[in-house]
Design a protein with these regions (language model features):
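Helix-start/capping segments and mature chain N-termini
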Residues: 1-115, 136, 143-266
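Extended, Lys/Arg-enriched charged tracts that mediate electrostatic binding to polyanionic substrates
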Residues: 124-134, 138
């Protein structure tokens, strides 16, 4: 893999005791381009703005997907990436639904591990937080025709982050607006899913709430998921969570909680 390193790191300017989520970035980015037939080689270069043609299809039709996962330092100062394989698998499921090319799981796994190894000094201690990884793919054809792009770019950028929430949340039960519908793209981490949620989320925040608990599109009586997480509740000593279907994201943390709960006999 070709790696172009920055001439001067930004590491020394970061206050790891004050990490605002998603606003502080590491020195480099991982890139791989799809030319319409096959993926090129992964490479790493210094983080910088990307240039795009105004007719790039992603700007008009939203053919874009992403993932989110974290790397941590353990007690031995070794780096652990939480369930990277599962995130790559889910990314490819999103790609299929959005008519985008799948990534080679093994090559992608190795490339992301090399990228994280390069940026390991940006990983906070476990008391401070973690390194948030944002893999994403965008369509890059230059056309205003409403068709699937043939060319795509896959990238990974990273942010040292603190803890996303520092207090319990006030949750608003949303029964007017809907996040997703059966047969749609709710199970995919498609960029537009999140843009569509901003307006009702802001309405909830104006009422003093932190997050929305979304309900089903049919009658608003079936609980689905939160804006930034899957939903669990405990009743009569048992742990419950909505069944996964195509309007609910297949949460990797959700799956981890279920495995742990079963292991503990819950």
């Amino acid at each position: 893999m070709h790696i172009e390193r920055v001439k001067e790191s930004t590491l020394g300017s970061i206050d790891f005791e004050k990490l605002d989520f998603g606003k502080i970035f590491t020195d480099h980015m991982l890139i791989c381009d799809f030319d319409g037939e096959s993926w090129g080689e992964f490479h790493i270069e210094p983080l910088k703005p990307i240039t795009m043609h105004p007719a790039s299809s992603v700007l008009h039709y939203g053919q874009a997907i992403f993932e989110g996962l974290k790397a941590y330092k353990n007690d031995d100062n070794q780096v652990n990436i939480f369930r990277l394989q599962s995130n790559i698998a889910r990314f490819n499921e999103s790609a299929t639904r959005m008519q985008m090319p799948s990534l080679d799981p093994d090559k992608t796994l190795l490339a992301i591990k090399k990228y994280v190894a390069l940026e390991k000094d940006f990983i906070p201690t476990k008391e401070q937080g973690s390194l948030y990884l944002r893999p994403f793919m965008i369509s890059t054809d230059h056309t205003l025709k409403a068709v699937s792009s043939k060319k795509f770019r896959f990238m990974v950028i990273a942010c040292p982050v603190g803890f996303y929430y520092d207090k319990p949340l006030n949750i608003f039960l949303e029964q007017t607006h809907r996040r997703a519908a059966r047969g749609g793209v709710g199970f995919a981490k498609a960029a537009g899913n999140y843009a569509a949620s901003f307006y009702p989320t802001e309405l909830a925040r104006d009422k003093g709430y932190d997050q929305i608990l979304w309900t089903d599109i049919t009658n608003g009586c079936t609980l689905e998921e939160l804006g930034s997480a899957n939903f669990f509740y405990v009743k009569d000593g048992a742990v419950h969570t909505p069944e996964i279907h195509d309007s609910i994201l297949k949460g990797i943390t959700r799956d981890s909680v279920i495995q742990l709960a079963k292991a503990k006999g819950l």
